[in-house]
Amino acid sequence: MVPSSPRALFLLLLILACPEPRASQNCLSKQQLLSAIRQLQQLLKGQETRFAEGIRHMKSRLAALQNSVGRVGPDALPVSCPALNTPADGRKFGSKYLVDHEVHFTCNPGFRLVGPSSVVCLPNGTWTGEQPHCRGISECSSQPCQNGGTCVEGVNQYRCICPPGRTGNRCQHQAQTAAPEGSVAGDSAFSRAPRCAQVERAQHCSCEAGFHLSGAAGDSVCQDVNECELYGQEGRPRLCMHACVNTPGSYRCTCPGGYRTLADGKSCEDVDECVGLQPVCPQGTTCINTGGSFQCVSPECPEGSGNVSYVKTSPFQCERNPCPMDSRPCRHLPKTISFHYLSLPSNLKTPITLFRMATASAPGRAGPNSLRFGIVGGNSRGHFVMQRSDRQTGDLILVQNLEGPQTLEVDVDMSEYLDRSFQANHVSKVTIFVSPYDF
């Protein structure tokens, strides 16, 4: 058994490597001596790694202590910030107002937040932002109803009253109110002779299913029932998920391009173009399935600037190269940048969590004891809020309806702190493809 103590192993090597001549028969062989040396080298390497890790941790602690001491003035600083109110028509998350504690805000459906969604208590006793408030959303302000439809406001929703000949939740579809294109008046397919019988000197007539009796007695005719028009009226259930086409005595449902009709003949299902046998995207790009279509993406890392550069470690992630020891600005840039793509239907019910950001510590290493989440970029910040769901997780929440087709981008940030000292931050760039349909 080889001693585990480095000192004991070293003494053993000295004794056994150079014995007295008369005891040479008890010496270690060359192979045994080399094996013992290798074990000692491995042991020293492990000790060196643990020592370096301890030094790094001690430096971090000393830097945090230096920062906290430097902030202390001659007078005692406040240990808490003023109380914050819950916004009218909104909610507040967080009841502690001590230094470095966070408070988050969100609004009820039908309202949007004006002001910061999160604030942090600073050591000087002030918050990082003003008290936010909730403002009512006018769902009709974007004029969502098409083709002369009238918009009616609702709570976090709207309703379109369509003019004759139009249908759909935004009056975007043309209702089939007459015979198909190419037919002529009196087409026998849409008007048929009734079946009549003489009963007790009176004539009784009836029509096949899907037709109704029209006209005066003795001159009646069976006219087609336009189910698409009948069930397209306000308050009646929809016959079709997408578009309804009237047919003689019945109807059929159609789906838009990029969708297939399911076995029930009414529902539509998106076709995933990205799983076909033949690739649809050029080499070097990745196919992202969207509602009724697809996108070919190839995200790129930020260009290098000065002593800051990034390397692509996977198709959807970039990592920052190590920073020079004296470069403080470099360390405050994102350590990792990841890319994410989501496909959503129009008019998705809100609020709903779309994306989740979290951290986990490597085994044997001290992880961050404080995380801060926020929205740091994008083209539609007002549609989203970033809210902490637990100590290690932040949720990106959609709080306003999205009307397609459109593409939204939002950048979310997670910053790590150890004993109030900044360690690193990570950015996730989320791209959202909104389809023109609500299915």
UniProtKB/Swiss-Prot annotation:
Where is the protein localized? Secreted, Extracellular space, Extracellular matrix
This protein's source sits in the domain of life called: Eukaryota
Kindly give the InterPro entries that the UniProt entry links to this protein.
ECM_structural_protein (IPR050751), EGF-like_Ca-bd_dom (IPR001881), EGF-like_dom (IPR000742), EGF-type_Asp/Asn_hydroxyl_site (IPR000152), EGF_Ca-bd_CS (IPR018097), Fibulin_C (IPR055088), NOTCH1_EGF-like (IPR049883), Sushi/SCR/CCP_sf (IPR035976)
Q: Which residues form a coiled coil?
A: 28-53
Residue limits of the EGF-like domain? 136-172, 224-269, 270-319
Sugar attachment sites: 124, 307
Stated family? Belongs to the fibulin family.
Q: Name one GO cellular component term.
A: extracellular space
Any S-S bridges, and between which cysteines?
81-121, 107-134, 140-151, 145-160, 162-171, 228-244, 240-253, 255-268, 274-287, 281-296, 301-318
Instruction: Report the source organism.
Output: Homo sapiens
Q: Domain (Sushi): give its ranges.
A: 79-136
Alphabetically sorted, this entry's keywords are: Calcium, Cell adhesion, Coiled coil, Disulfide bond, EGF-like domain, Extracellular matrix, Glycoprotein, Heparin-binding, Repeat, Secreted, Signal, Sushi
Which Pfam families does the entry link to? EGF, EGF_CA, Fibulin_C, FXa_inhibition, Sushi
What modifications follow translation? Answer: N-glycosylated.
Protein name according to UniProt: Fibulin-7
